[in-house]
Amino acid sequence: MKKLSLILTAIFFTLFALSSSGWCWGKKKIIKIGINAPITGDIPKVGENTKNTAKMWLEDIEKAGGIEIAGKKYPVELVIEDNEAQAESAVKVNTKMITEDEVITVIGPQSSKQAIPAGGVADSYATPMISPWSTNPDTTKDRPYVFRGCFLDPFQGPMLANFVKEEFGFTKAAVLYDVASDYPKGLAEYFKQAWEKNNGEGSVVSYESFTTKDADFSSQLTKIINSGAEVLFVPQYYNEVALIVKQARELGWKKPILGSDSWGSSETITLCGSDCYGAFFSTHYASAGAEGITKEFIDRYKKKYSYVPDDVCALTWDSLKLAQKAIEALVEFSGDIKKDRENVKKNLAEIANFEGVTGNMSFTPDGDPVKCAIIVKISDAGEFRFYKSVCP
Amino acid sequence: MEYFLQNFINALQWGSFYALIALGYSMVYSILMLFNFAHGDIFMSGAYIGFCIASLFIFLFGGVGAPGWLVMILTIIVSMFLTSFIGVLIEKIGYRPLRNAPRASAAITGLMIGIILETSNIAIFGTKRIAFPPLVETVTYNIAGIFITNKKIIIVAISLFLMAGLHFFIEKTKWGMAMRAMSYDFFIVPLMGVSLNVIAPLTFAIGSALAAAAGILYGLAYPVLDPYMGILLGWKAFVAAILGGRGSILGAALAGFLLGFIEIFTAMIFPSTLRDLIAYSIILIILTIRPHGFFGKAHSSSLRL
Amino acid sequence: MQPRYFATFYLNYKNMKRIIGFKKILGFFSAMPALGWLFGFFSAVIIEYLIGNNIAWLLGLPKIPVLFGFLIMLKKPLLIPGALAYIIIVYLLPLTLTARFFSGKINKLAAKLYKLPPPVYTVFYLIFLYIIIDIWAGMSDYRIVTLKLTFIAIILTLSLNVINGYMGEFSCSHTGFMALGAYFASTVTLILFTNDKLFGEALLPSYLAPFLFPIALIIGGIAAALGSLLVAIPSFRTRGDYLAIISLAFMFIVKSLIENLEVLGGARGMGGQHPLANLPTVFIWTILSIWIINNFVTSIIGKATNAVRDNETAANAMTINTRRTKIVTFMFAAFWAGVAGGLFAHVLCYVNPGTFGIKKLAEIFTMVYFGGLNSIVGSIIGAVAFNLASEALRPLELFKWIIIPVIMILIMIYRPTGLVAFKEFDIKKILAPKGDK
């Protein structure tokens, strides 16, 4: 008994001495960047993609020896925290990263449900935050410190409506969306608005919905098919897209199907197969036939993690690069975290024509990016082929 | 009329999933009086096991050129067998130690086992969603404007077959009789030489096997598997199982079909945004009028949690 | 737990006590009254406030370990000894010293206080407790957020315990009540105090907001209570399993209703609330809820709920109006769930119908059944333990969701009704002085 406690005490003190040596090297200036990702919870895939992308970015930085500010290189540390895809956890995590870990900027959370309350936290602590994926206008509205990496529903919805009108001249459309999820819902609404402005009242002949996690859409699709619509708009995530498109084909739908940027994942084709061939969707980049840094990014990612990155990866990458650019533009890294955050925010707002994986972008005063969208057609080989580019 | 018939067929397919899962719920619920909240996740595990088995069979028999339906039948049988072990294991770990505890505690254990199943699933298969292999080539028949696929026929037929088989088992065999006896009283029946430690695992095994069958059929109809697919379906099947009434296993199947019909037809008649609202209001009203489900007997004092 | 298991455990525990000599080391803790604990923590908090940073620096920690070092332990295992040493120095040492040397004096003080009327000394204790919490939380905003959400979890757990524990129903509608409360309270504060795209200009200047916030919360609570009638009325004729799905259906209905109400923002949620739920507000509401719920369950109607749980027919025969009991209990519990929802909405400054789903329900169930049925202390322990564990295990990511269920299953197997079930909560006993014979 005595021996055991002696050994335990010895171990304790050795470890203690080891850890205490921390204060010899502990007070080095480190740039900390927080990643607020849904690693567990409803959307673990999004969290994993965010984490993977962030790690790839960190690798780059480490290879370069850190981020260079005013001619001096500083090491970077990522603080990756799990928000469990829950609003309250996202708030806790953001508070923790900002007040405890003293990150200079936060990347994430991804979906609006977490990004809106977390954005409130970031704004109240005057810490710049970039949400790569949140499309809800409330995320950045009246919040000077909150930015986002993707384009907004009010741009994407009308753009798709106009595209169909110019390209095909259809006048009757049907929409099928998830009423319990804010991204599809917002997009569906803006699409409907724009379509009815183009083609007159009642030209969206069928406007149907379901609830998250539903798998059977046959009733809604039967309604849509019977309504005589000429095109079906499905602003859904890729797992639902596969089910909807397959069921639509089984119920006899042969007309075009239109999607949104959430289709832009290699899994769309893996899950959906040949049923999705010939469909159009808007996105940030076309992975087949991509050029320049986009291609480079896709190839690297694919090599490292052995799957083609989706829009979450690309947007997170761009957000990280934006943050990096803003930090690099600092006049000096003072170590006074408040001052640095303020300057980073100022730099972020001033970024113009940033060349990202998802296209060139600048920020509006609200913190929303202005960038072009691409219409992609899924070819008969299952590749995303560039079809058309639309700029605001 | 076409429109109605088309939706009728849609509802038949959707309802058969609820029915199959509700049957498994109802087995445990009627015989052992437990809420098996892990059932939705057993269904999910069944689907994943089915995916593994199907991939294995396709890999083995792909070269030989075995017909798809044979692979499908084999997959269903093997996965049902394997998944029933999960059921037995859950009974042993989660429910047997709690036999004398309040029933609500067992319900909580079930909930926790469900979370463990989901998490370990992510740990094994990763966060990626998985495409279930199309075992049977989809053929669409157009009969007077109604679209029916061969898959729909297969799904409804297999689930009806399983239900009939279960009914036969419960009503005609010795084991079935033991189960029915157990549902009357599981304090006295063990004294008659029927061991609860045999009947309870058997009940769980059969329930889980049915869930596995449902999982594979689900994979055929909706070929995207994700680790959380069992949660909502499980809770809804739970509604169906209890709606059917305690002590009535086929009542659960009927209630499952009814739930499917309510969901599909409310979406057909009303704006589909209001589907959940109306469908669950209907269930609330049904239960207010018939407080013991469709086929349940009124014995409220024994229903304490 | 079966008696024989209990006996073995108890014996082992006793043996352990003798072998390690717990009694010798920790004996003097048993003579310490509640006031002593408060004094101990007070001194700990003061020490942390004054020199916490220096101690942390000396121990090689980057900052003071906010949640007792849980957060850094799992991320940087090398810092574990430092964090442990910090806890020993800052928390355990003052506590032990207070217990060792000041027990007698504090006991005398506590005895003096105890002679005052109970409301007076209870308020004194609460103020003292709040001062400690405020200083402790004031050192880091992360502590404040965690504490606020923990307090809200306490209210939720207590109110569900009233239905599930005291009345013995299995109600799955609690997140529905919470959603109703959150939405109604937010609507009131948004209409009155925020320039908002949903409801237009603010009607009142925002400096009035903190004063009218309780009214908004009460409106939220009342809305939830009225909503609960939808569950309570069918409960006249049925119970147990059927009531479980009635309440589940109710939860789906509320969620779907909010998703369809464009006025409330639908699935997009409702944001822009003022951060009105600050720490004192949440603290006061939590204390209020504990006090009132405790009074409720010890009142005649509270005893009636127990009777309804144990045997409804017999209760009826004993002239208990079971219908009235059920309605009142449901409305009462739903009221507090609504208040908790309102506070929750004003902590996050955003509500979304997706938040109030099955996942949240499972969380509340876990807290109730972990802590213990039919017990106020149990609920508090359940809520605090779950929230702390949830924060502490966060760095484990996926494995957190294996560890928490496993713990829960073990608790259910060895203590099927929860850790501290069927305990009366008597504030006088807790605050009584100890040791003097």
What are these regions (language model features)?
Chain A
Residues 2-16, 20-392:
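Extracytosolic ligand-binding ectodomains
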